[in-house]
Structures are given as C-alpha cells and as structure tokens.
Amino acid sequence: MSIRVLLFSIFTGFLLAAAGPALAQGSRIKDVASLQAGRDNQLIGYGLVVGLQSTGDSLRSSPFTDQSMRAMLQNLGISTQGGQSSAKNVAAVMVTATLPPFGSPGSRIDATVSSLGDATSLRGGTLIMTSLSGADGQIYAVAQGSVVVSGFTAQGQAATVTEGVTTSGRVPNGAIIERELPSKFKDSVNLVLQLRNPDFSTSLGMARRINNYATATYGAPIAEARDSQEVVIQKPRTADLAQLMADIENLVVETDTPAKVVINERTGTIVIGADVRVSKVAVSYGTLTVQVNETPQVIQPQPFSSGTTATQPQTDISAQKTGDKVAIVDGPDLRTLVAGLNNIGVKPDGIIAILQGIKSAGALQAELVLQ
C-alpha cells in the first residue's frame, strides 16, 4: 500500500502534506530504523582559515585569532616577535564533522567550518590542519582543505550586498579519519534496532516481519519488540552477522505514525499529517485592515512677504473589514478540511489561529506541535 501525498498551497508560505484515505505505508527497515551499535558520533575542533581577501578577523577585535596564528607560526619554527599584523586574511573557526558508524582509518568525511570572530566572509579561504576530537577527548580525524561557501558578499564604499551566509562553509571530503571507534558489532549476541519515529504498531509489525523471515530461514523467531522504539534481535548461532543484517534491513514493513499538525509561526508554514481528523465545527473568520497614508502639502508664502516655504501634514485613514464568513468544517479527511478553510479565504496567520482554536475546542483529533 502507498500513501498519495498531495501538496496544497493556499497562500505563500502555507504548505499542507496531505493524503487520501489513511493507509499503511510499506517501507524498508533500513529507512525507518537504525542499528543501536552503528550510531554517528560528533567531532569538533578549533582551527584557522587563511588566504582570505581582507574578509578575515580584525586581530584587535579577535585577540584569540592573533594568539592562534602566533602559536601556529612558532610551531613551524617562525619567529613572531615584533609588531601586530594588520592583515585581515586569517579567521578563527570552529570545525565540526560527523564520524559515521564503522568508519575506518583513511576514509574521508565532510567538515563544516564556522567563523568565531568578526570575519565577514570565508570565501576563497583554506582550512589548515585541524584536529577533530570526540566527546572523550581523543582525536579521531584531521581536517584540511579549501572552504566552499554558498553565499557571497559584494562591498563598495557606500553599500554592501550579502546573499546567503558567508561566515560558514564546508570542506568536502576534507577530514581524514585517523582512528576508528571501538565496535562490538562482530561480537554482539543481541542487536537492537531503534525506530526513528517511535510507534508501538510499527515496532510490533517489524518484529513480526523479522520473525517470519527468521522462521523460514533459521527455523525459529529471533525478534522481540521491547517498546515503541526498540526491537531486540537475537543472533542465530549459524548466522553470519553481516549477512543477517543485510537481509533484515531490506525487509519491508508497514509503518504507522500518530496524527500531527506541525505549525511554524515564524514562517507561516503548516504541515498536516495524513491521519488528521476534525470533528464538525463552525469557524468564523474576519479581518480588519487599516490603511494610513501621509501626504504632506507644500505651502508657499505670499509674494514679497519675506516668508518661508513650509509643509503641512495631511493624514488619510481608511479602514476596511473583510471576511466575517462562517464555514462548517467537518474533516473526515484532509481534503474536506482544506476545502472548508478555502471557503472562508483565510491567510496563513489566520489558519494558524483557526487550527489552535479548533484544538482548544476539542475538535482536532491530532497532536498540535508549535515550532
């Protein structure tokens, strides 16, 4: 079975993820769950980006950049005694990366750099050798390479134009893994699959699907749903662990998720899940628009009166009330809900207020998530 996803755009910034009749969706286990023993790990480090075109840190405003540059040069055997440099071609940055599960020494991962000081752009810079450490303080990777920045800045004597973010960027494949995390995958007796979206129905369905496969292959069930998020798998004695996981992660299970409505009040974005239901409710919507226009009038003095030209303010205020429509919204499915809101011509901010009111009235059969 598959869900048909429909996108409804009522006004700019209003998005609805919808569906026809709510049906269970078939997904591979690898797409809905991850192996507990194979999780990612975060790495962090401090470094310098050099080669900037006068867009780096001001060494007076960012003393840590000057200290780091001097320490680096001293480590290279270069004397730093003398006056302070006024060049702005160096920037202090924080470097982050994600160490994937089972990452082996010598393989490469992406690194992200973010400015710490008052640099205006990292475009054209090069990250010099930076050690990346884990939460245990051990060094797991070393990053170095050219920084790729998506935004740009154009500056003149009287104006500056900036598009996107220029104070952060990426070093594609710029970090080399030097140490792998200790892994007990090969020695594991029990494996734990963790659902990315915890749900009892999905967890039990996954355990049943794995047991059907195991019974046909090994002659006995091997999986048990521990709770809404975890499914425990016991390794058969004759099974190769890598082959077992390769077979299990490609099994297709029917997934289920609770009904949710997610609202981002800053952007006016609304996402409504497929299983959202609305009980019969009446909605009234109206808006008051007030427009204020300032049109100053120029008053000229009389001839030979030695007067001066003056301006007299003139304000025109108009008010218009729109809406005041009442619609009966009864949502056996999402299409009916969208049609009901369209009938009264609501805008994104009005839709947010209406959904909050419907939830308060107890007519929205879903979880309302505000971001």
Curated annotation (Swiss-Prot):
Belongs to the FlgI family. Coiled coil: none annotated. The keyword Magnesium does not apply. Keywords: Bacterial flagellum, Periplasm, Signal. The basal body constitutes a major portion of the flagellar organelle and consists of four rings (L,P,S, and M) mounted on a central rod. Residues 301-322 are annotated as: Disordered. One of its GO terms (cellular component) is outer membrane-bounded periplasmic space. Pfam families: FlgI. GO terms for molecular function: structural molecule activity. It is found in: Periplasm; Bacterial flagellum basal body. NCBIfam families: PRK05303.1. Assembles around the rod to form the L-ring and probably protects the motor/basal body from shearing forces during rotation. InterPro entries: Flag_FlgI (IPR001782). The gene is flgI. This is Flagellar P-ring protein. GO terms for biological process: bacterial-type flagellum-dependent cell motility. Residues 1-24 form the signal peptide. Residues 301-321 have a biased composition (Polar residues).
